[in-house]
Amino acid sequence: MIASVRGEVLDIALDHVVIEAAGVGYKVMATPATLATLRRGSEARLITAMIVREDSQTLYGFADSDARDLFLTLLGVSGIGPSIALGALAMYDGPTLRQAIGDGDLTALTRIPKVGKKTAELLALTLRDKVGSSTSSGVAAAGGHGIRGPVVEALVGLGFAVKQAEEATDKVLANDPEATTSSALRAALSMLGKK
């Protein structure tokens, strides 16, 4: 696939740029921040991800490979397509987006266009370990509890907010470090039921 494009900038629009490389004009979708760094007539190089669908082949361009890698990671979440992933990177820079996902910050994640509460919870739950998390949300995980993730995931699946599920699971595991998945889930449900 096409990993990068370098050449003269022929045209810049609100959501894409056309870069001529070896006599071919490539339309590359990009965030407004990336597009703002480009100038018509100058040479540019964008790191790209090529998304092939049944009815289209689309290039997405990024200033660096970290942004491209985060874009591809976002695509791994059910319900997140290229336009939402690009919208997330348009809304937040890479470190800020990683922090929001790592912290399970649903308020920040629901500000992304076309991302509702359920999708934000799924983003946080699915990608927390892949994009990194803050020290406050990773206390139990850092302690080596392999059951934390499955318990939190089960609680979210039952309709609890990610933050609630994490707090309850962390309290249960702090009180009983030897808990099994099922005993931790029962204790967390009991704790959440009392609130």
Curated annotation (Swiss-Prot):
Top-level taxon of origin: Bacteria
DNA damage found in the keyword field: yes
Region called Domain II, residue ranges: 64-138
Annotated keywords: Cytoplasm, DNA damage, DNA recombination, DNA repair, DNA-binding
Coiled coil: none
SUPFAM superfamilies associated with the record: DNA helicase RuvA subunit, C-terminal domain, Nucleic acid-binding proteins, RuvA domain 2-like
Region ranges (Domain III): 143-195
GO cellular component: cytoplasm; Holliday junction helicase complex; Holliday junction resolvase complex
Residue numbers spanned by region Flexible linker: 138-142
Record-level GO BP terms: DNA recombination; DNA repair
Localization per record: Cytoplasm
CDD domains in the record: UBA_RuvA_C (cd14332)
Gene Ontology molecular functions: ATP binding; four-way junction DNA binding; four-way junction helicase activity
Region of interest (Domain I), residue spans: 1-63
HAMAP family listed in its UniProt record: DNA_HJ_migration_RuvA
Domain topic, free-text comment: Has three domains with a flexible linker between the domains II and III and assumes an 'L' shape. Domain III is highly mobile and contacts RuvB.
Job of this protein: The RuvA-RuvB-RuvC complex processes Holliday junction (HJ) DNA during genetic recombination and DNA repair, while the RuvA-RuvB complex plays an important role in the rescue of blocked DNA replication forks via replication fork reversal (RFR). RuvA specifically binds to HJ cruciform DNA, conferring on it an open structure. The RuvB hexamer acts as an ATP-dependent pump, pulling dsDNA into and through the RuvAB complex. HJ branch migration allows RuvC to scan DNA until it finds its consensus sequence, where it cleaves and resolves the cruciform DNA.
Subunit structure, interactors included: Homotetramer. Forms an RuvA(8)-RuvB(12)-Holliday junction (HJ) complex. HJ DNA is sandwiched between 2 RuvA tetramers; dsDNA enters through RuvA and exits via RuvB. An RuvB hexamer assembles on each DNA strand where it exits the tetramer. Each RuvB hexamer is contacted by two RuvA subunits (via domain III) on 2 adjacent RuvB subunits; this complex drives branch migration. In the full resolvosome a probable DNA-RuvA(4)-RuvB(12)-RuvC(2) complex forms which resolves the HJ.
NCBIfam families: ruvA (TIGR00084)
Family as reported in the entry's similarity comment: Belongs to the RuvA family.
Protein name: Holliday junction branch migration complex subunit RuvA
